[in-house]
């Protein structure tokens, strides 16, 4: 069972199931970049657990019925961060969407890439924030829609914070953030 824990990045509390190190790091890297789609079987459960924790933290107790249930209830949508065009071409699938489907959940396709941001690997905290600034846009109006943002790995939080901005700009409200894993690298400016 994963050790779901809160991660704070700027003013955001993000629920993460794993720490991106050791076996978790190898499994996630193999799944995302090594073509090991079979690793989804091991990774879907931890991501689901992070989403359950995010739902449990929503004011009004929208966590669902019973321990471990992931019943978002009416109006709460699971919104993933869209893959870059390059990543889609290389992989042929969107890793987080595939994990949600494997966990019996359904992503709500609310966001699109406005600009093709650089790969975040190797960028520091400030460079990541600048790289992601205004890179996402909502595909439609999100007026009145409650959202839990879901991503694979949180480092500095730049991607999730940009997604939160894009959802708010379209009229939606982010009520939670969940990730498969968090890494503690690159937390200094």
Region annotations inferred by a language model:
Residues 1-189:
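Glycine-rich phosphate/pyrophosphate-handling loop used in enzymes and phosphotransfer proteins
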């Amino acid at each position: 069972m994963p050790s779901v824990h809160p991660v704070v990045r700027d003013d955001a509390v993000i629920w993460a199931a794993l720490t991106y190190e050791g076996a978790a790091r190898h499994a996630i890297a193999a799944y995302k970049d090594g073509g090991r789609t079979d690793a989804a079987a091991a990774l879907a459960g931890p991501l689901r657990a992070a989403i359950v924790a995010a739902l449990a933290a929503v004011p009004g107790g929208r966590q669902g019925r019973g321990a471990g249930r992931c019943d978002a209830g009416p109006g709460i949508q699971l919104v993933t961060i869209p893959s870059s065009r390059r990543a889609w071409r290389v992989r042929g699938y969107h890793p987080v969407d595939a994990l949600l489907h494997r966990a019996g959940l359904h992503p709500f396709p609310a966001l699109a890439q406005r600009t093709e941001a650089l790969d975040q690997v190797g960028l520091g905290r400030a460079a990541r924030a600048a790289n992601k600034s205004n890179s996402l846009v909502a595909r439609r109006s999100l007026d009145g829609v409650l959202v839990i943002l879901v991503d694979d790995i949180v480092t500095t939080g730049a991607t999730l914070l940009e997604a939160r901005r894009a959802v708010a700009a379209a009229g939606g409200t982010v009520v939670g953030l969940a990730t498969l894993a968090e890494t503690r690298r690159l937390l200094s400016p």
